[in-house]
Amino acid sequence: MAERSSNGYKEVPVRQSEESTIAEEEKDTLLEARSYSRRDRKRSRSKAVWFLIALLLLSNIGLLGGLIHYFRKTHHKEKDVPWLPPKTVGRGFVNINNDTALPDQPGLDQSLPHQRAMISVFHQLHCIYMTREGYYAAREGNLDQVNAAHLMHCWDYLRQAIMCHADTTLEWIPAPPNDKGSTGWGVEHTCGDFDAIARWAEDNRLKTTYGIH
């Protein structure tokens, strides 16, 4: 039976070449560990960045949907705003009896005892309505619902109508710093009796349709 030694642990001498090899192995192990650690951190950061991007995209999609809903809701609510043209029965189209000679105008046939016409103010209000509808359709992205040729006609027609009536009411400029112009609100104008015109148009209506479009 082999005898047991009572000697304690002793440091085993290592040759320089072996010490160098061990040091290199330890160094490589540490570098590899650091490399894995950096990769893990990069992966974690990358996942966090992608998560934030996805969260922002979802938030923006939700915001966009909310804005579209708001604009559409606002559009429908604003259909009853006070400036919306009144819906007169007959839409401003009237029958005219040629009892007396009328000035020659485009579309007028003097040989007929009855003539059809549209009262200009209703044409103007119709154009305002079309401009408004085109604006909301474009804002909601429904460009196929915008009749560009009709709008161009309406803008030119309204321009000439405004210049024809040429309202010369004075709109006073406020004191500084609000002296850039005038809102025109509250200023008195000399106006025609639109209610009386609308009643006459309904009494002599050509059509029984209701609306302004």
UniProtKB/Swiss-Prot annotation:
Q: Which GO terms describe its molecular function?
A: oxidoreductase activity
Tell whether Nucleotide-binding is among the UniProt keywords. Answer: no
Q: What is its main location?
A: membrane
Q: Where in the cell is it found?
A: Membrane
Which keywords are on file for this protein? Glycoprotein, Membrane, Oxidoreductase, Transmembrane, Transmembrane helix
Q: In which pathway does it act?
A: Mycotoxin biosynthesis
Which Enzyme Commission numbers does its entry carry?
A: 1.-.-.-
Positions of transmembrane segments: 48-68
Please describe what happens when the gene is knocked out: Decreases the production of ustiloxin B.
Q: How does it sit in the membrane?
A: Single-pass membrane protein
Query: Where are the annotated glycans?
Result: 98
Short motif (HXXHC 2): ranges: 150-154
Does the record bear Oxidoreductase in its keywords?
yes
Single Gene Ontology BP annotation: mycotoxin biosynthetic process
Annotated Gene Ontology cellular components are: membrane
InterPro entries hit by this protein: UstYa-like (IPR021765)
Q: Which residues form the signal peptide?
A: none
Disordered: annotated segments: 1-26
Span(s) of short sequence motif HXXHC 1: 123-127
Q: What task does this protein carry out?
A: Oxidase; part of the gene cluster that mediates the biosynthesis of the secondary metabolite ustiloxin B, an antimitotic tetrapeptide. First, ustA is processed by the subtilisin-like endoprotease Kex2 that is outside the ustiloxin B gene cluster, at the C-terminal side of Arg-Lys, after transfer to Golgi apparatus through the endoplasmic reticulum (ER). Cleavage by KEX2 generates 16 peptides YAIG-I to YAIG-XVI.
Q: What is known of its domains?
A: The 2 HXXHC motifs are conserved in ustYa family proteins and might form active sites.
Family statement: Belongs to the ustYa family.
What's the protein here called?
Answer: Oxidase ustYa
Organism in which the protein naturally occurs: Aspergillus flavus (strain ATCC 200026 / FGSC A1120 / IAM 13836 / NRRL 3357 / JCM 12722 / SRRC 167)
